[in-house]
């Protein structure tokens, strides 16, 4: 056999193995990422934030539900949910049952587009050349948005969609603000704009999609840390290189993890979650395992 056919067969076998790994192994390899952020006043106690995003849950996803149910064992001080919880209305009840152990933990949330309507079949390669939009929303299956909101609020969690809130945790005065989904141009930062209130120890921003305009506005207002999701970490990444897309105007190098947003007014930390799920029409991850994050906020040096 000549060299070229051998190489072709080897390439095909490698591609098939990579696809099988991404579709059947990595997409279910849920993990917890630990991140430290030095943003608290000197002498403060540490604060643990559990950042959950992009579950895209189907009711039949037993392993994902078991992982979610075990998150209470991380003992967070605050839960931040940055949206895209559901892929079908039938997933609402099992989701809330799995989250039930976090019922007594303070929490906040904002919604993403898939908390309003369900996903639709799409060509995943299209994300490499342009951002997905919301033109097809009218043809998508409605999600139980208000039931989801009410369920989170029954836990005592605060809806930050266009709202500000304050918490007292571990002796810290924490201010939070959030926006609706910028990917659908639903963000109206004017609803929450302005500097943190006097006496606030740490100010956090929460949004689903990390578009530059939202990150800039929050940074200009002096927020210490901004939490977002939406990107799936790129979902399909190149080993040694990283993400190819973020489905937003954020640089691919910032598709997941901690980075800084710089404006003329200053800088803010930004944490983008790679999320726990995928669209049910592209249930595949490669070099980008599904995750939640525990952010430990510590005193700044």
Task: Please provide the spans of the model-predicted regions.
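Conserved beta-sheet core of the metallophosphoesterase superfamily
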Residues: 210-293
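N-terminal active-site segment of His-dependent metallophosphoesterases
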Residues: 8, 15-98
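Beta-strand-turn-beta hairpins that frame and shape the catalytic cleft
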Residues: 38-50, 157-158, 164-176, 198-202, ...
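Active-site environment of divalent metal-dependent phosphoester hydrolases
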Residues: 57-62, 86-90, 114-121, 140, ...
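Active-site neighborhood of phospho(di)ester-bond hydrolases with catalytic His/Asp-centered motifs
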Residues: 51-53, 78-84, 107-113, 160-162, ...
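Membrane-penetrating hydrophobic segments
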Residues: 1-11
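Core catalytic region of metal-dependent phosphoesterases/phosphodiesterases
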Residues: 63-167
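Binuclear metal-dependent hydrolase catalytic cores centered on His/Asp/Glu-rich metal-binding motifs
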Residues: 122-157, 161-163, 169-216, 282-285
């Amino acid at each position: 056999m000549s060299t070229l056919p051998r190489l072709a067969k080897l390439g095909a076998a490698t591609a098939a193995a990579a696809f099988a790994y991404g579709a059947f192994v990595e997409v279910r390899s849920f993990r917890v990422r630990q991140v430290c952020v030095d943003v608290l006043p000197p002498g403060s106690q540490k604060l643990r934030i559990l950042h959950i995003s992009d579950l895209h849950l189907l009711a039949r996803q037993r392993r994902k539900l078991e992982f979610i149910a075990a998150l209470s064992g991380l003992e967070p001080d605050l839960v931040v949910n940055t949206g895209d919880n559901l892929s079908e209305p039938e997933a609402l009840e099992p989701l809330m049952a799995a989250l039930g152990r976090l019922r007594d933990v303070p929490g906040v949330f904002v919604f993403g587009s898939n908390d309003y309507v369900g996903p639709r079949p799409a060509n995943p390669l299209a994300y490499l050349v342009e951002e997905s939009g919301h033109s097809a929303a009218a043809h998508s299956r409605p999600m139980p948005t208000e039931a989801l909101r009410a369920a989170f609020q029954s836990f005592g969690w605060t809806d930050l969609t266009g709202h500000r809130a304050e918490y007292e945790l571990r002796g810290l005065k924490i201010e939070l603000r959030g926006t609706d989904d910028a990917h659908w141009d639903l963000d109206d930062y004017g609803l929450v704009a302005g500097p943190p209130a006097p006496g606030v120890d740490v100010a956090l921003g929460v949004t689903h999609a990390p578009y530059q305009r939202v990150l800039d506005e929050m940074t200009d207002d002096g927020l210490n840390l901004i939490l977002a999701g939406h990107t799936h970490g790129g979902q399909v990444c190149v080993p040694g290189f990283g993400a190819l897309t973020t489905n937003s105007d954020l640089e691919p190098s910032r598709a997941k993890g901690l980075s800084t947003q710089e404006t003329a007014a200053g800088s803010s930390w930004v944490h983008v979650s790679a999320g726990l799920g995928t669209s049910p029409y592209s249930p595949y991850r490669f070099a980008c395992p599904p995750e939640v994050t525990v952010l430990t906020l510590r005193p700044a040096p």
